[in-house]
Amino acid sequence: DYLIGKDPFRIEDFNQNFLRSVYFRGSVIMSAISAIDIALWDIKGKALGVPVYELLGGKTRDKVRVYASVMHLTEDNQKLAEQYQQLQEMGFTAAKIFCNGPTSSTDGKGEFYSSRIEREVEKVRVCREAVGPDFDFVLEVHRGMTLPEAVAFGRAVEPYRPMILEDPVPPDNVDTMAEVASKVGVPIATGERAIDLREFEVLMARHACQYVRPDVCAVGGITTSKKICALAEAHDVLVIPHNPLGPVSTAACLQICASIPNLGIQELPGFCLNGAEDKMVKEPLRFENGCML
């Protein structure tokens, strides 16, 4: 009821009111605030007859490079390599590799430190050989390693030149993430679980990452996302918007990507590749040569 009859152009005012007045502000509440904020930006852009990125300062680029965020459900490295060759043939220049295998197995071998590290490193090696040097990898660990495992794994994959090591350890302890970042040569990305501007400030101030991953559907919408990007710029940190959701999230992310100077790359969820997302919208987004246009 709060918004009924009010001026939808007062986006910052509403955003501040929601953030300050809500008593319990967890991820569910922040997702609701984010949805309202994205809708308000959409209303304003349509009312003024301009894309949202024009309201955010205008374009800094004409296309946005994306990486394929795909779920690979095979333990066969050869089949895995073939999947990445197929992505390359589709025009992608970057993709995610899941390196968060189980820490346990029926024979107990999965619990061995050396065995686990070797298994995940081999996965990266095989994929690199399959696609060659002109392809970037985002190594997704999903917070699945301990500090010593993350350091060992990060150092072991350095020869294969991954672009990003994402969430190697749980980000709740910022000092642990910062220690990993200080000991490996692969840039760290984190922040997909953060729901507050100040969480990102702590991550960057303690040098826990080289890339931040704000989720426009969780941090407070486009309004807060733009602030996080500006904060990252001040810390010389690049931005990789988190985007595991549907077309509204993708469209909102692209408005941000188009308007910031410190974009790293944009995540594109796997279901976008099979046309599922196109069926949800009147005008599907265009993908060409590794970029969204």
Predicted regions located by residue number:
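Metal-dependent enolase-superfamily TIM-barrel catalytic cores that perform enediolate-based chemistry
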Residues: 63-64, 68-183
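Active-site phosphate/pyrophosphate- and oxyanion-stabilizing loops and adjacent acidic/basic residues
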Residues: 42, 54, 58, 125, ...
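Metal- or metallocofactor-binding catalytic centers and their adjacent structured scaffolds
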Residues: 1-48
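A hydrophobic, small-residue-rich beta->alpha segment in the mid-to-C-terminal subdomain
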Residues: 1, 290-293
